C-alpha cells in the first residue's frame, strides 16, 4: 500500500500529517488482511522526529518535520550546556542539526509549555506502534538518533537530559 507522505506547512512550520499517515497505515492493514492472517508487523519511518504526549496519552501539538527550520542555531544553545566534542564523545552520534537533541532545544526555547506539559515522548514509528497497540515503547536503534542515548548502557543518558534541562519523562 503506497501513499503520498508530503509534509504540511502551517504558519511557516513544516509538520508531518500523522493523522493522514495513520489512516493510510490502517488502510494498508485492511488490504493485507485480504490475503490472510497477519502474523506480525513492523513499523519503520524516518528517525529523529517525535510526538509529545500528555498525561492522558493525547498528542501535544503536531509532529514537526526534521526539515523544518526551527532547529537553526539550536546547536549553539545545546553547546552552552555541553561542548560539541564532549557530546559526540558521549553519544557517538554524528551531529545533524535536525537530530532530536536540537529539536527538543527548539521546543524548550520556542514552546517551553509543551515540554512542561509532556509526560512522555515517542519517536514517530513508536507513536504509530502505540496507536495500533496501546503500548508505549522506544525502539533502541531509532532512539539513538535522538543523540540522547548512552551507547554503553543502551539507555537514555539521564545525566545529559538533566544537563540540557529536558524532562526525564
Q: What residues fall within each predicted segment?
A:
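Short, charged, surface-exposed secondary-structure boundary motifs
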Residues: 9-12, 73-77, 148-150
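Short beta-strand-loop/turn "lid" adjacent to the catalytic site in phosphate-handling enzymes
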Residues: 30-66, 94-98, 125, 129-150
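Residue-level signal for inorganic ion chemistry
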Residues: 17, 41, 68, 107, ...
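N-terminal glycine/serine-rich phosphate-binding loop of ATP-dependent small-molecule kinases
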Residues: 1-62, 89, 117
